[in-house]
């Protein structure tokens, strides 16, 4: 366990060195998480590209389970999240794909969709329930469409984002949240009702709305 923890810390140290101002905003949230989960609403049209992905990856889009899961955020589970976040961010090299194309990083390259799908697959391989691993779409502070992996835990809904190094609470990102997949099935999406205003603990500034 000690060697595993030291390895994870080494990965995190390398990852922190490569990210910019967005990462700096979120670093204060790597210890304390909010318990507030996302609030979802009506059914919405799934993101472009999902249908093509499901045609090629049927197993990924089948019904995940009967009940939504909230994973207990034990030290080992937390370490899983940090390792997967760091490893996938380092393993996949950024490349702008068409937003209509979703897929895994078969050639080692991809966009935000690729990072989110790879993290979901990696956590499933480590024994995490699919019903706790949810893809979510948002609009960034610069107005760009973005996809991330949201993990439902006892410590809150946590985000694994390719734009920053740490795992963060969803309320701490300067995004306008749009929609999220249903817990049981990747092909069903719902609106995200709560759109929190990010407050910088360092500067006391609010970003987004």
Q: What is the meaning of each model-derived region?
A:
Residues 23-209:
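A structural boundary/capping signal
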Residues 1-4:
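Positively charged n-region of N-terminal signal peptides that target proteins for export
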Residues 7-18:
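Bacterial N-terminal signal peptides
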């Amino acid at each position: 366990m000690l060697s595993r923890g030291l390895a994870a810390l080494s990965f995190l140290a390398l990852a922190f060195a490569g990210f910019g101002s967005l990462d700096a905003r979120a670093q204060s949230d790597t210890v304390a998480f909010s318990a507030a989960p996302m609030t979802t609403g009506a059914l919405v049209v799934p993101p472009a590209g999902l249908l093509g992905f499901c045609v090629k990856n049927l197993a990924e889009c089948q019904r995940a389970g009967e009940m939504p899961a909230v994973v207990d955020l034990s030290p080992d589970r937390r370490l899983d999240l940090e390792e997967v976040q760091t490893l996938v961010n380092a393993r996949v090299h950024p490349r702008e794909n068409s937003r209509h194309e979703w897929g895994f990083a078969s050639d080692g390259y991809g966009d935000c969709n690729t990072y989110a799908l790879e993290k979901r697959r990696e956590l499933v391989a480590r024994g995490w329930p699919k019903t706790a691993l949810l893809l979510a779409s948002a609009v960034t502070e610069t107005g760009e469409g973005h996809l991330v992996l949201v993990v439902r835990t006892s410590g809150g809904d946590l985000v694994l984002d390719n734009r920053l190094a740490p795992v963060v609470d969803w309320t701490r990102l300067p995004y306008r949240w749009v929609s999220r997949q249903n817990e049981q099935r990747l092909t069903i999406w719902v609106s995200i009702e709560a759109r929190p205003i990010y407050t910088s603990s360092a500067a006391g500034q609010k970003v987004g709305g």
